Amino acid sequence: MLVPRFYEDLNVMHDKTMPARTYYIPASVRMNDLVEHRERSDRFQLLNGEWKFQYYNSIYDVTESFYEKGYDVSGFDQVTVPGVWQMDGYDTHQYTNIRYPFPFDPPYVPQDIPCGAYVHNFEYHREEKASKAFLNFEGVDSCFYVWVNGAYAGYSQVPHATSEFDVTDLLNEGENTLAVLVLKWCDGSYLEDQDKFRMSGIFRDVYLLKRPETTIRDYYITTDVEKDSVVVKLDMHFAEPVETKVTIEDKYGAVVARGKTAANGVLELTVLNPVLWNAENPYLYQVILTMPDEVIVDRIGFRTIEIKDKVVYFNGEKIKFRGVNRHDSDPETGFVISIQQIKKDLMLMKQHNFNAIRSSHYPNAPYFYQMCDEYGFMVIDEADIEAHGPFMLYRKEDTDQNRFHRWNEKIADDPAWEKAIVDRVQLMVQRDKNRPSIVMWSMGNESAYGCNFEKALAWTKKFDPDRITQYESARYRNYDITYDYDNLDLYSRMYPSLQEIEDYLKNDGSKPFLLVEYCHSMGNGPGDFEDYFQMIHKDDRMCGGFVWEWCDHAIAHGTAENGKTRYYYGGDHGETIHDGNFCMDGLVYPDRTPHTGLLEYKNVYRPVRIVSYDQENGQMVLHNYMDFDDLKDYVDIFYEMTQDGLTVEKGKLANVVASPHSDAEVELKLQVPNTGKIYLKLIYRLKKEMPLLEQGYELGFDEMKLANEDDRNRQAVKWLEQEKVIGTIAVKENDKQLVLQAKDFTYVLDKRTGLFEDMQFAGRSYINHPMELNIWRAPTDNDMYIKLEWEKAHYDAAYTRAYRIEVLQNKHGVLIMEHLAVVADTVQKILDVEMTWKINEDGKIEAVIEAVKDKEFPDLPRFGIRMFLNKKMDEITYFGMGPQESYRDKHQASCHGLFRSKVAQMHEDYIRPQENGSHYDCDYVEITNGQCGIAAVSKNPFSFNASVYTQEELERVSHNYELKESDSTVFCMDYAMNGIGSNSCGPDVMDKYRFDEEAFQFQFELIPFVKG
């Protein structure tokens, strides 16, 4: 073997690497713009680009010294660095959540480890005043060996940490050869079991830093914030001591403090009347470290974070983290994430009211945190540790106690892993210690708890007592051991029910409560943002939460014939061990198009809310949910009053003043119309330009219904009370059919089902297939557990049968009285139904359904009718909640209004197709082809869905690009639908959102019409 077996040695994580240090980019002169443009530094030489590459199925196949200078690599392929070799067509993609993709046999990994050999030639020219050269790798998965000009330079692991090598003595003037051997797995892979696609290669930047012999090696900036000043302490470490001038400037370039380092490298400076950094006003100062031959410019923010009386305070104010978990993921580049891609994510997060990010579950590229400093995000920086795999080991006794005991003992509580775990925490802290945006250190994710994490926490708290710590897996412990939690500041939980949170706050509450993951955003969902918001703001000990997660993880494989991107998830690449589409759990699609769940989050976390409004005297109370900004400085508030969806009055509220976390009283007197559904909408727009946000950007809205004499929707009333036409209806029947015929229509009712199988109106065919009573929906990802009960109850195979059909006819029309049931093979009757149809001479159909569910059965997915309308009926007008999909527990981003759309545009195109596109709290809907159509209306609010796809088609296929359109416009009119929730990885749907009624009545009318 060409290389030593460091990759299976827990005592060797690194060989010949430099000690970990803070991140910075030096230059020969002062440069202020290196955060997003570090390539502009004359001391920074980027080695990215086209490299020679050879993939090997096994490390044992690497038999030749490819790293030797002059080795013939003409037979090698060419790849782009940074990159991951799976995206370049080598090896295969694999998505797995918890299970290791290899046997659990630490520290050993499979003998035939796939690996990649990289070779790159580059020019290097030594500078007289910067004669030292340091080779930096910011991200390599999983471990790697390095050679420069054929000479061994070192070894390192920990994929998301920077590895730095002193290669001064290995470089030649002029052309040089850099060679790297990257292994897919190493002993560290047992700590790299993050929920993501597993990818390999050099996935972050590679560069040289040219540096003087005598210069700063490392520095640590800490601050002591007082009422009117801040003491800035710089603790510097030198390669060799050198006098360093230190200047601190405010954002406008004015010098606020300056000094020179003492011999011991320690300097304290005082800044008077400091502006403190926070996510709403990310005010940064510049620190300029000037040495004879080098200048380092860094940016610092002054801020405090502390816990008092079990409450988290930031700059002395109670804080709520409005956070999201973010992975590095792109469908085209994999783990490779550019500054532009990061900026796009941060912009979208700002636009949707996030103020915090958890770097799940590893440190991001170092400039990510500098960008969070600048754009205003509080960050949980998380160590590159997840050892979730031992949780899945085979156990005879599968109790919680044994499960946690076995999970803990394998890695977290095995001293053999102490060095590796502490190393990963130290690499993170040392690199990122000077970033003001980082307010919390996380020891990792889902790795159980034990002595090794106690050591990591103890080191972290000793090194940096000013930040808080969290580690959710501390609760997964061996019950036979008493652990030390003194260095853990928060009680962190993933996906607890609201009742669990209530119980903790009532019975324990010893630490602030953090929802480190909540509201699992998989597919159509989440349906519980508002309820968690209310819980978070109910108790000061709740410091907020981080939604799981930011983006769907998928791999793009070109474009299908229908123009849709072929996104692949777990199992689509032929891998045996995988977790399906569980990686498709983001608030944005892989290309960053927002899900409706992101829109829901945005409006739930709007900066202002209506507390109350006295319609009589016009007195309104608003609450400011901002942590630092007064409303008068942050938002302009506009109002609109609508009548049945049309604006009748609008304007702007004046003099809205409210300090953070307090109320404002304003006056808004409105002339409310006597008739129609009247809604008042407040729209909150950004008053000032902010990082990543333009002035005038809409931050959210409030909507409230106003009282009046007749609050019925006037168009719905017209449909319900339209003048009857005098005429006659001919009734014919046989054993199977009941035929109703009048001047303008012919309706055929199937006597076996009690439902219409054909509808002709004004010479046009309205339906292509028989009407159905519908209790099924294409299961959402959040239905993954309840759907097992639904399928056990055979809801997915239910159909309608009739027992009795009675027909009465009088001068008002035809009355059809029916006794029906919803049944399915092998199970008892699901629903017993009494139904009445009334058909008027003008073709209007009035329906009354009274249904009783067998108590043995689980909650229904939905109940309503399904019609397969003529496909040319593709235009929708409705009054209800829109414009995006809305459900009983997922409608905070929607408002009541009059909306128009094409049917095809109402489809929410989830990558794994599922129930979508419903609209909640509707009064009426009209579906037309431009000339004729059908109206569905009810005295009571209903939900509807109009789609080009059947629910069977949505359930049949695994990917959206496989969908085949129906020959009909599929129209579902629902009395009710079960809530959406977030049960894909969270609690059950809350009781108040369940469709658990055992008896209910549904009244509606169907009215065919011809325009004009």
What spans do the regions from the language model cover?
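Beta-strand/loop-rich accessory regions of lumenal/periplasmic or secreted enzymes
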Residues: 87-89, 184, 278, 669-676, ...
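Extended substrate-binding grooves/exosites of carbohydrate-active enzymes
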Residues: 1-39, 96-98, 151, 190, ...
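Core domains of carbohydrate- and sulfate-ester-processing enzymes
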Residues: 48-115, 180-212, 310, 387-398, ...
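Accessory beta-strand-rich segments of carbohydrate-active enzymes
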Residues: 2-18, 37-38, 52-56, 84-88, ...
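Intrinsically disordered, low-complexity Pro/Gly/Ser/Thr-rich segments with frequent PxxP/GP/PP motifs
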Residues: 260-272, 645-675
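Surface beta-strand/loop "capping" patches
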Residues: 213-240, 595-635, 721-735, 849
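An acidic-aromatic loop/edge-strand motif
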Residues: 84-87, 92, 99-108, 157-159, ...
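Extended acidic/polar, glycine-enriched regions
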Residues: 172-175, 235-307, 678-715
